[in-house]
Swiss-Prot record:
Residues 1-22 form the signal peptide. Pfam families: Serpin. This is Corticosteroid-binding globulin. Cortisol binds at Q246, D278, W384. Expressed by the liver; secreted in plasma. Proteolytic cleavage leads to an important conformation change. This reduces the affinity for steroids. Major transport protein for glucocorticoids and progestins in the blood of almost all vertebrate species. The record marks C242 as: Conserved cysteine within steroid binding domain. SMART domains: SERPIN. Glycans are attached at N88, N216, N252, N319, N352. Changing D278A: Loss of corticosteroid binding. It comes from Rattus norvegicus (Rat). It is found in: Secreted. One of its GO terms (cellular component) is extracellular space. The gene is Serpina6.
Length: 396
């Protein structure tokens, strides 16, 4: 299937609602009602976060955030979280939306065999609060989540419990969520995701070398730089000045590495949209390249209240929220935290796999070095969910 066709699926499910039956016209039409009217939800969210901290690494998982917002809407008297994701509740029922997220979660876990991905939501509430049984049953059924009672008055102990729970759920990959709470809360939702993949064409660890990464005009850091040569999907964009390549993971994961021209990061980020991805997909062609990509691990933590205040759902995270469908104790003050972690390395070498193409090719390859700030977009090709979006400013 071509990247252009995949882009059509992205148009239908930027917020992550697509099913295995999407290949048929009938099923496709049935899911158009679930597709958000704002198909650029993921890009808008990403662009906002980069604008807040343009000189820092940015990492989010749009599909994980979408699931968290949909889960919180269960039983809530307000529907702005679903509407902000683009759902028309006059055409699609809330039950259908939650069933689709349930199926999406299943598809991601079943289809991404080449990705080590731990994604989920954990709820923590005051010991004296009582959530309704119907709400607890729904979050477990649709989102495989649970609610744990802790003592927020002893915040040191409470934060340790939260961190340990997420550490256990991610098999030790995410060890720390947060230590401070900016404002009092009676209900904390932690949305987390860890991702690491196996490249379809893995890098050879023997070729990894220490090289310079130019953070800005005055700052340079040393990073382990992975190297391989071969035929890779490539495009040089003169309209939105950048170079980009696409690399697949084993299974259904795929990654777009986007290298803006000097001083053009803001221009390229502002141009990210469904139409831009569609255009790139049509113009990308295989090219012999010498590819240099830094090996790194980055993580980011966000207060969703700060992230979502421009998406018309900030009332969900304030004292004005009505969670009468969720708890017998209202009003309820909600804090939502998003924690994302990405590990990018050579990838485990599978039996019978090759460690990239030889470093010396007959034709003269193009050198592409990601040795300055770049953009990284990770998708699931089967559902075309936005797994990760990142601006990598300093991989050291």
């Amino acid at each position: 299937m071509s990247l252009a066709l995949y882009t059509c699926l992205l148009w239908l499910c930027t917020s992550g609602l697509w099913t295995a039956q999407a290949s048929t016209n009938e099923s496709s039409n049935s899911h158009r009602g679930l597709a958000p009217t704002n198909v650029d939800f993921a890009f808008n969210l990403y662009q906002r976060l980069v604008a807040l901290n343009p000189d820092k690494n940015t990492l989010i998982s749009p599909v994980s955030i979408s699931m968290a917002l949909a889960m919180v809407s269960l039983g809530s008297a307000q529907t702005q979280s679903l509407q902000s994701l683009g759902f028309n509740l006059t055409e699609t029922s809330e039950a259908e939306i939650h069933q689709s997220f349930q199926y999406l979660n299943y598809l991601l876990k079943q289809s991404d065999t080449g990705l080590e991905m731990n994604m989920g939501n954990a709820m923590f509430l005051l010991q004296k609060l009582k959530l309704k049984d119907s709400f607890l049953a729904d979050v477990k059924q649709y989102y495989e989540s649970e609610a744990l009672a802790i003592d927020f008055e002893d915040w040191t102990k409470a934060s340790q419990q939260i961190n340990q729970h997420v550490k256990d759920k991610t098999q030790g990959k995410i060890e720390h969520v947060f230590s401070d709470l900016d404002s009092p809360a009676s209900f904390i939702l932690v949305n987390y995701i860890f991702l690491r993949g196996i490249w379809e064409l893995p890098f050879s660890p023997e070729n990894t070398r220490e090289e310079d990464f130019y953070v800005n005009e005055t700052s340079t850091v040393k990073v382990p730089m992975m190297v391989q040569s071969g035929s890779i999907g490539y495009f040089r964009d003169s309209v939105f000045p950048c170079q980009l390549i696409q690399m697949d993971y084993v299974g259904n994961g795929t990654a777009f590495f986007i290298l803006p021209d000097q001083g053009q990061m803001d221009t390229v980020i502002a141009a990210l949209s469904r139409d831009t991805i569609d255009r790139w997909g049509k113009l990308m062609t295989p090219r012999q390249v010498n590819l240099y990509i830094p090996k790194f691990s980055i993580s980011d933590t966000y207060d969703l209240k700060d992230m979502l205040e421009d998406l018309n759902i900030k009332d969900l995270l304030t004292n004005q929220s009505d969670f009468s469908g969720n708890t017998k104790d209202v009003p309820l003050t909600l804090t939502m935290v998003h924690k994302a972690m990405l590990q990018l390395d050579e990838g485990n070498v599978l039996p019978n796999s090759t460690n990239g193409a030889p470093l010396h090719l007959r034709s003269e390859p193009l050198d592409i070095k990601f040795n300055k700030p770049f953009i990284l977009l990770l998708f699931d090709k089967f559902t075309w969910s936005s797994l990760m979006m990142s601006q990598v400013v300093n991989p050291a």
